[in-house]
Amino acid sequence: MSLVSGARDMGFDDNNNNKNNKDGDDENSSSRTRADDDALSRQMSESSLCATEEEEDDDSKLQLGPQYTIKEHLEKDKDDESLRKWKEQLLGSVDVTNIGETLDPEVRIDSLAIISPGRPDIVLLVPENGNPKGMWFTLKEGSKYNLKFTFHVNNNIVSGLRYTNTVWKTGVKVDRAKEMLGTFSPQLEPYNHVMPEETTPSGMFARGSYSARTKFLDDDNKCYLEINYSFDIRKEWPAL
């Protein structure tokens, strides 16, 4: 559900180490540090830089029904009043005469934004090739934030639009998240979806550069956007 999960989920929690070490001598402290390093390595050793096809497409085995145009959706089960009202509510003010015959939906991700209390929103425009150059953004360790997606849907209803995000640090996969965004009908106005609040990890193991892959897919496992990018976590936010 996030760009990068909290410290405990990723094995980057320094606070417990500090509490355990405060009464120990230097030798015990070094031993515990080495043990923590080994534990972190074991925790992440089974992950690789490239996620497997099974991990990336673990929903691909779902057996889905036939796809319909919007006009066909409206005609189907038209005698069922509850279904008819639900479809009308879902479609809203869609001009069926213009797009009702198009089978495949089109989803365009316009931008991603990182919203953090007391900070201006970090608005990330998506390059056409889906691969931002250099470091795409910087996060402060231990900071709370929400992700916000702005996107357009055209042509037809998109069912089960979802977001996946995989994160690597020094070539080792440290996090993978999925979030169901929902089902959306085509409309002229953009959709905005805000993710639940998350907290960036903190501590010296958490700071540094990361690489990540974000995807937006639907129930048919059709990928509308894949973004491969880099970001980093620092002690402080970059200067405005």
UniProtKB/Swiss-Prot annotation:
It is found in: Cytoplasm. InterPro entries: Ig_E-set (IPR014756), Rho_GDI (IPR000406), RhoGDI_dom_sf (IPR024792). Residues 1-66 are annotated as: Disordered. SUPFAM superfamilies: E set domains (SSF81296). The keyword Lipid biosynthesis does not apply. Gene3D superfamilies: Coagulation Factor XIII, subunit A, domain 1. One of its GO terms (biological process) is Rho protein signal transduction. Keywords: Cytoplasm, GTPase activation. One of its GO terms (molecular function) is GTPase activator activity. Interacts with RAC-like GTP binding proteins ARAC5/ROP4 and ARAC3/ROP6. Belongs to the Rho GDI family. Regulates the GDP/GTP exchange reaction of the Rho proteins by inhibiting the dissociation of GDP from them, and the subsequent binding of GTP to them. This is Rho GDP-dissociation inhibitor 1. The lineage of its organism: Eukaryota, Viridiplantae, Streptophyta, Embryophyta, Tracheophyta. The gene is GDI1.
